[in-house]
Amino acid sequence: MALLQIAEPGQSAAPHQHKLAVGIDLGTTNSLVAAVRSGSSEVLRDEQDRLLIPSIVHLTEDQAIVGYEAGQLASQDPQNTIISVKRLIGRSCTDVQQRYPNLPYQFNATENGLPLLKTRRGLLSPVEISAEILKKLTALAEQRLGGELTGAVITVPAYFDDAQRQSTKDAAKLAGLKVLRLLNEPTAAAIAYGLDSGQEGVIAVYDLGGGTFDVSILRLSKGVFEVLATGGDTALGGDDFDHLLAEWIVKKSTVAPQNDREKRQLIEVANQVKVALTTNDKIRISYAEQNLEIMRDEFNFLISGLVKRSLLACRRTLKDANLTPSDILEVVMVGGSTRIPYVREQVGEFFQCTPLTSIDPDKVVALGAAIQADILVGNKPDSEMLLLDVIPLSLGIETMGGLVEKIIPRNTTIPVARAQEFTTFKDGQTAMSVHVLQGEREMVTDCRSLARFTLRGIPAMVAGAARIRVTYQVDADGLLSVTAVEKSTGVQASTQVKPSYGLTDDEIANMLKSSMEHAKEDIQTRLLTEQRVDATRVIESVYSALQQDEDLLDDNELSAVKNALVSLQKLIQEEDSLAIKQGIKMLDQATQEFASRRMDKSIRRALSGQHIEHIK
């Protein structure tokens, strides 16, 4: 007699069946896919036993070729072979063309200013091209694992903003891949480097890949990874080393490439030289029928400025965490560019310790993402892992006078929700505009606008009576939702912030720098603006009161109040916050008796016609 398989309603008959989940390192230069098999994380190889899949997409009329085969077609057909698409994702067309003027691609802009690449297959967005890479990785994983994927953890640079993160999720959706979570690349590397070992202390993750640089400072404590601070540069990586070498080759040979195909061939030669110099002190180069020679010391000199740039970002990030290099227990090296001996040497000197390089720097991010994916699908229910990422830039709201009130400060652990109450500025105000901002400065004009929406249906009340609760919520992927609720009626409005394009490289670098450079000036400006807003509010309140109850004052009292009003109105035009503050105080003193009489009048009106027994 056959045994029956019995399960609770809605429960799988095999509840402990291993679910297939992967970690994907969607890189600028190369991409990898990894999975946990037999209890350990491993990178999945393709049919030719290769680990790295070049992030290159070649487009024909009817198909997309991804990886090595696409790379072989790059020099023959550069306009239809898209390389380093990660640099383009989440950016505006203008930003792309200004930042990368030498790209061999032609662009059209959408109505929202997003770039579309002109290809043989038609106009395609960076999201659609990224989706082709994800399709390739998904197919590879399902072939190697022997089944359909439940989902994937996809890694992104810690410095990716909301638009870039959302674009990555959109690419996965187009590829038919469920995103379990977006995970910061440095955090993924830290997981791979011993979360289960119980090690405690502060570590730095130095991630120098093909197109982006990230540094994260993490505290490890009893199975908890807390990101103390993040920094980096979205336009710094091994690709930039290649371009510097290419310029050196052109200068030495005096032969410049004449077309896109020759440019691509030159970059390929430069990349081969860079790789060879990681293990050799001297390399011979054959280019344009000339034989050149470059020493490793010359290469080190060429890239020294870029390496220094990365270390300056490290110093800024340490400062954000209130730490010094000597506080760092270990440094984890991530990204293929960290194989360069000069990079390892300079990082070691800066942090005063020998960097960790025991895990292949190309694999480490994918391996960590796979571990996280395995946990998220429930294959490791006893895991005590807890990841605490942070937001890279403060999120705030515009208040009267063009000021920014920060709701969630920079480097706050996510996921997070913060709420703050605001009120109306004018009598009878029935709507409120909510302006969502990103940045570290005190004034709206110096921060980045993320979204605007309007809360309508506020009951008409005197200024300051309504209570509007504004909630900012950032999920585990760093995406922001904002909700505004009027408390007495429950009327609400909300938005999910999906900016049409991301921050430019200059904006990312300058936002933090300018906040430090202008800190003193910004505080003075804020104090002055706050006093002006307070003064304006008081003046409007007094004029409103006079319209209703001017008869409560005699001529001398009325004259004194009006003189104080005129004086304060003049002070508002000046640049002296202390003088305005004193003017508010003088007006307050001039209206104290008036306020007392108005209060008495209100009480008499409220008690009129009531029997004393009814008054409690």
UniProtKB/Swiss-Prot annotation:
Biological-process GO terms, alphabetical: iron-sulfur cluster assembly
Q: Which Pfam family, any one of them, does this sequence belong to?
A: HSP70
InterPro entries the record matches: ATPase_NBD, Heat_shock_70_CS, HscA_NBD, HSP70_C_sf, HSP70_peptide-bd_sf, Hsp_70_fam, ISC_FeS_clus_asmbl_HscA
- GO molecular function list: ATP binding; ATP hydrolysis activity; ATP-dependent protein folding chaperone; unfolded protein binding
Q: Keywords for this entry?
A: ATP-binding, Chaperone, Nucleotide-binding
The record's function comment reads: Chaperone involved in the maturation of iron-sulfur cluster-containing proteins. Has a low intrinsic ATPase activity which is markedly stimulated by HscB.
* NCBIfam families listed in its UniProt record: HscA, PRK05183.1
- Family that this chain belongs to: Belongs to the heat shock protein 70 family.
Q: What is this protein called?
A: Chaperone protein HscA homolog
State the organism named in the record: Histophilus somni (strain 2336)
Organism placement in taxonomy: Bacteria, Pseudomonadati, Pseudomonadota, Gammaproteobacteria, Pasteurellales
